[in-house]
UniProtKB/Swiss-Prot annotation:
Membrane-spanning segments: none
PROSITE patterns: G_TR_1 (PS00301), G_TR_2 (PS51722)
Gene Ontology MF annotations: GTP binding; GTPase activity; translation elongation factor activity
Superkingdom of the organism of origin: Bacteria
Annotated Basic and acidic residues bias: 302-312
Function: Catalyzes the GTP-dependent ribosomal translocation step during translation elongation. During this step, the ribosome changes from the pre-translocational (PRE) to the post-translocational (POST) state as the newly formed A-site-bound peptidyl-tRNA and P-site-bound deacylated tRNA move to the P and E sites, respectively. Catalyzes the coordinated movement of the two tRNA molecules, the mRNA and conformational changes in the ribosome.
InterPro entries given in the database record: EFG_II, EFG_III, EFG_III/V, EFG_IV, EFG_V, EFG_V-like, EFTu-like_2, G_TR_CS
Family recorded in the similarity comment: Belongs to the TRAFAC class translation factor GTPase superfamily. Classic translation factor GTPase family. EF-G/EF-2 subfamily.
The encoding gene: fusA
Protein name: Elongation factor G
SMART domains xrefs: EFG_C, EFG_IV
C-alpha cells in the first residue's frame, strides 16, 4: 500500500447494544461501497458479516468479522477497514479486542430504545482505549422513533457532548431522509433503487426554521474549539464556510470533545451514504493517532513506533479464528513497518520466529490474498504455530511488547463430557481450539471429580460453544447444570514463619521464610499479587526472592476453602534464612506454597460470588411481580424509572447464582411482555449460610466457615 494512502485509511468499528442494527448497517455499507451485489438481511439469516451458522440462526453477531472496503468522498478514495462487533454482553471480549485495534468507531443506537445497558458498557470500553466516535441513530422508521430524545440520553446517561450534524425529515412511517446542517440541503432516498440513489434538494419549507435553529446550535458547539470561528459566530455566522465547520468538527471529534450525530434507517436503506461520507470526514486516520507505545523486553524501557512503513515492524494479534479452508487465521493490526507474505516475524511472548506463509485482507469470511500489510492496516495471516490473542509481532532485532488486552474472568461454568467415549480426543481438541480463539472461555479438569469444566461469560456464550463443538468438531456433548464461578478472599492479616526441610540421602532441601499475608492495600487496584520484599542483610539471597513470589502466584490459583482462586493477595517477605548447600529456587517456591496454605486458613477466608447488574423493562402492571421475584432471588433494586413508551425500567444488582433460567421465568411472570439484560458488575462476599451450602456441595464439608 502506498504511504500517502494512510491519510485515506479508516480503521473503524460499529459498536452498540444488541438489536440496534449494527450488522444491518454494515451490510448496507458493503452494498453501497460495491462489495456485495445483493443485500443480506439479518432476519433472513443471510447477512454477509454474520458468517457463523449460529449467528445466522440466532440473528445476533458473535465474532467480529473484519472487512476491507472503499468509498469515494470529496474527490478521494478512502480505504475502510470495518469491524462488526457483537452487542450481546456475553461477547464483550470481542468488543474489547476490536476497540484495542481501531482508530475510530460509529456508536449505533436504536431510535426507539435509545441508550441501553450494553451501550453504556461499550461506551466505557471505547473511553478506556481513547477511541473517537460519531453517533448514528438507526431505525428512524420504527414506531416511537425520536432522534432528539436519543441525543438527550447520550448527554444524560453517557455524559457525551452529542452534536446533531443532520436532523431527520419525518419520523416513523414518514421518515424520508435528512437535512444536512453543514450543507443546509435536504437529502432524500429513493425506495425503488434500494437507497442506492438519492437526491439533494432544498430544505422543505416546514423544516427551514428548525434546521436554522439546529445549525446555530451546531455552530455554537464547534466554535468552542476554534477561536477564529468563535469570532465569526458572534460577528456574522453566515460567513462561516463549509470547510471551516468540517475542520472544527473533525478537530473536536479527534480530541473526543464532541460526538457528531447522524440518523437513518439502515433496513429501509436511508442515511448510510451520509454516514459513510462523515466517517471519512471526521474519524481519524492511523496518522492522526499517537505513535504506539510499547516496552523493550530487553531493557524494560518504553519505546514508541510511528505509523510508517520505514519504522521497525510492530503488530498486535487481536483475534484468532479457525477457518475450514486455510486453518488457523490470525487477525492483526500493523502499527509500524510492514508484514510481508513469506517473511519471518518474531513473537515476543513465545520468543520464537514464525513464518507468515500467506496474508489476506478479509471480506467477511472470504479471503483476498495480498503480498504485504503495511503500517496502519488490518489483515490476517496464516502459518503461525504458537500464537495467542494479545501477542506482539515484531522484528527480531528490534523487539517490543505492546500493551496487551485485559479480559474479564469467566463467571459461569458447566461440566461437559462426550456422548460416546470414542469422541474424547475430538472433544479435547475442539475445546483447545475454541479456548485459543476466545480469551474469556476457559477449560479445566476438576481435580476431585475428573470432569471437564468449561467456563464463559454467560449461558448464551456456553450454548454457542456447545453448538460449535457439534457443528465444527462433530462432537455431541452431555452437559451438567450451570455452576457459578466463585472466588475466595481473605479478610485478616497473618504473620507466619514457614520452614521447608527435606533430607533424603545426599543433598537435602531447605528454605525458611517469615511472611505477613493479608488483603491488598486500597490503592493497589490492578489485582493479583502485591509482593513486598523487606528482607535485610541478605538473610534470603536475592536470587531466591523471585521463587518466593512465584510460589505465592501459583498458590493463589487455589483457595483454602474450596479451591476457588483468589483475586488479590498482599505478601510482605520480612525475613528468613537459607542453607549454603541445601537451599535452591525450588525449595523457596515450595516453602511459599506451604506458607500460603497455612496462613490463609488463619486469615479469615471467605467465599465471594459474581453479582450482576440487571435491567428489566416491564409494563407498569407487572412491576410488583417482577420486583417480588427479584427479592426472592436475593436481588437489590437500585432504582426505577419510566421509559418513553410508558414501560417501567427496573435496575437491580442480583447474584448470578440466582439468575439461571431468568429469561424464561420473566417471560412467564409477564406473559412475554418484559425484556431483560444483564452484565457482570463485581464479586461480593456471600453469607455464611450460602458459603456452607456451596462448600457442602463442592467439598462435602462445612467446618471451614
Amino acid at each position: 500500500m502506498a504511504k500517502h494512502d494512510l491519510h485515506l485509511t479508516r480503521n473503524i468499528g460499529i459498536m452498540a447494544h444488541i438489536d440496534a442494527g449494527k450488522t444491518t448497517t454494515s451490510e448496507r455499507i458493503l452494498f453501497y461501497t460495491g462489495l456485495t451485489h445483493k443485500i443480506g438481511e439479518v432476519h433472513d439469516g443471510a447477512a454477509t458479516m454474520d458468517w457463523m451458522e449460529q449467528e445466522q440462526e440466532r440473528g445476533i453477531t458473535i465474532t467480529s468479522a473484519a472487512t476491507t472496503t472503499r468509498w469515494k468522498y470529496a474527490g478521494n478514495t478512502y480505504k475502510i477497514n470495518l469491524i462488526d462487533t457483537p452487542g450481546h454482553v456475553d461477547f464483550t471480549a470481542e468488543v474489547e479486542r476490536s476497540l484495542r485495534v481501531l482508530d475510530g468507531a460509529v456508536a449505533a443506537y436504536c431510535a426507539v430504545g435509545g441508550v441501553e445497558p450494553q451501550s453504556e458498557t461499550v461506551w466505557r470500553q471505547a473511553d478506556k482505549y481513547n477511541v473517537p466516535r460519531i453517533g448514528y441513530v438507526n431505525k428512524m422508521d420504527r414506531s416511537g422513533a425520536d432522534f432528539f430524545e436519543v441525543v438527550r440520553q447520550m448527554k444524560d446517561v453517557l455524559g457525551a457532548n452529542a452534536c446533531p450534524v443532520v436532523i431527520p425529515i419525518g419520523a416513523e412511517e414518514s421518515f424520508k431522509g435528512v437535512v444536512d446542517l453543514i450543507k443546509m440541503k435536504a437529502i432524500l432516498w429513493h425506495d425503488e433503487t434500494m437507497g442506492a440513489d438519492y437526491s439533494v434538494e432544498e430544505i422543505p419549507a416546514n423544516l427551514v426554521d428548525e434546521a436554522n435553529e439546529w445549525r446555530e446550535k451546531m455552530l455554537e458547539k464547534v466554535a468552542e474549539f476554534d477561536d477564529a470561528l468563535m469570532e465569526k459566530f458572534f460577528d456574522d455566522p453566515s460567513t462561516i464556510t463549509e470547510e471551516e465547520i468540517l475542520r472544527a468538527l473533525r478537530a473536536g471529534t479527534l480530541k473526543m470533545d464532541i460526538v457528531p450525530m447522524f440518523c437513518g434507517s439502515s433496513f429501509k436503506n436511508k442515511g448510510v451514504q451520509t454516514l459513510l461520507d462523515y466517517v471519512c470526514a471526521f474519524l481519524p486516520s492511523p496518522l492522526d493517532t499517537p505513535a504506539i507505545v510499547g516496552t523493550n523486553p530487553t531493557t524494560g524501557a518504553e519505546e514508541d513506533r510511528k505509523p510508517s512503513e520505514d519504522e521497525k515492524t510492530s503488530a498486535l494479534a487481536f483475534k484468532i479464528a479457525t477457518d475450514p479452508y486455510v486453518g488457523r487465521l490470525t487477525f492483526f493490526r500493523v502499527y509500524s513497518g510492514k508484514v510481508e507474505a513469506g517473511s519471518y516475524i518474531y513473537n515476543t511472548r513465545s520468543g520464537k520466529k514464525e513464518r507468515v506463509s500467506r496474508l489476506f485482507q478479509m471480506h467477511s469470511n472470504k479471503q483476498n490474498p495480498v503480498e504485504v500489510i503495511g503500517a496502519g492496516d488490518i489483515g490476517a495471516g496464516v502459518g503461525f504455530k504458537d500464537i495467542r490473542t494479545g501477542d506482539t509481532l515484531c522484528d527480531e532485532d528490534a523487539p517490543i511488547v505492546l500493551e496487551s488486552m485485559e479480559f474479564p474472568d469467566p463467571v459461569i461454568g458447566i461440566a461437559v463430557e462426550p456422548k460416546t467415549q470414542k469422541d474424547l480426543d475430538k472433544l479435547s481438541n475442539g475445546l483447545a481450539k475454541l479456548a485459543e480463539e476466545d480469551p474469556t472461555f476457559t477449560v479445566k479438569t476438576d481435580e476431585q471429580s475428573g470432569q471437564t469444566i468449561i467456563s464463559g461469560m454467560g449461558e448464551l456464550h456456553l450454548d454457542i460453544i456447545i453448538d460449535r463443538l457439534k457443528r465444527e468438531f462433530k462432537v455431541e456433548c452431555n452437559q451438567g447444570k450451570p455452576q457459578v464461578n466463585y472466588k475466595e478472599a481473605i479478610t485478616k492479616t497473618v504473620e507466619l514463619r514457614e520452614v521447608y526441610k527435606k533430607q533424603s540421602g545426599g543433598r537435602g532441601k531447605f528454605a525458611d521464610i517469615i511472611v505477613a499475608i493479608g488483603p491488598v492495600d486500597e490503592d493497589f487496584t490492578q489485582g493479583g499479587l502485591q509482593f513486598i520484599d523487606e528482607v535485610k542483610g541478605g538473610n534470603v539471597p536475592k536470587e531466591f526472592i523471585p521463587s518466593v513470589q512465584k510460589g505465592f502466584q501459583t498458590a493463589m490459583k487455589n483457595g483454602v476453602l474450596a479451591g476457588y482462586p483468589l483475586d488479590s493477595l498482599k505478601v510482605v517477605l520480612k525475613d528468613g534464612s537459607f542453607h549454603p548447600v541445601d537451599s535452591d529456587q525450588l525449595s523457596f517456591e515450595i516453602c511459599a506454597i506451604q506458607a500460603y496454605k497455612n496462613a490463609c486458613a488463619k486469615a479469615g477466608p471467605v467465599l465471594t460470588e459474581p453479582i450482576m447488574k440487571l435491567e428489566v423493562v416491564t409494563p407498569e402492571e407487572n412491576m410488583g411481580d417482577v420486583i417480588g421475584d427479584l427479592n426472592k432471588r436475593r436481588g437489590q433494586v437500585e432504582g426505577m424509572e419510566s421509559s418513553r413508551s410508558g414501560a417501567r425500567i427496573v435496575k437491580a444488582k442480583v447474584p448470578l447464582a440466582e439468575m439461571f433460567g431468568y429469561v424464561t421465568a420473566l417471560r412467564t411472570i409477564t406473559s412475554g411482555r418484559a425484556t431483560s439484560s444483564m452484565t457482570y458488575d463485581h464479586h461480593a462476599q456471600v453469607s455464611s449460610s450460602i458459603a456452607k451450602a456451596v462448600l457442602e456441595e463442592v467439598k462435602g464439608r462445612v467446618d471451614l466457615v
